[in-house]
Amino acid sequence: KRNQLDLFLDIHAHSNASNSFMYCNSTENRALAERESLFPRLLDSNSSDFSFQQTKSDSDPNKEGTGRRALGQMLSPGVSCYTLEVSFYASTNSACKLVPYTQQSYMELGRNVALTFMDLYKLPGASNQKFRRSSHNRNSNRSSFGGGGFS
């Protein structure tokens, strides 16, 4: 049996911004844009160090060689392709203070990414609170990507 790819997630570290956030591929298709925003919105609700406000849709020609952009062009339009960027040094907490990343906080982000997949695909156990160590509502403006024309 052949399975269809539904989502591609490329994970990178970065040194010039705090938090974790995503780059998504730009699209003019409103329905596809809304679908693309779902995974980052869910991760934002599951992870205190993820910033939906910093998440951007991007079609920068300099990024043509990235996995997200290359696979976005090669695969069917229904496949969501993301780059998850994670800071080398810190996230910003609800009081706008920098909180240094530790091995534990990186592991917590990984756990929250897994929980987000469970939420996205409505997998059994996704609502089980024993798996959820931290959730938040830090970002009040969840209406649009930071630079991509989604709303």
Segments (PLM) and residue ranges:
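Structured catalytic-domain cores with a bias toward divalent-metal coordination
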Residues: 1-151
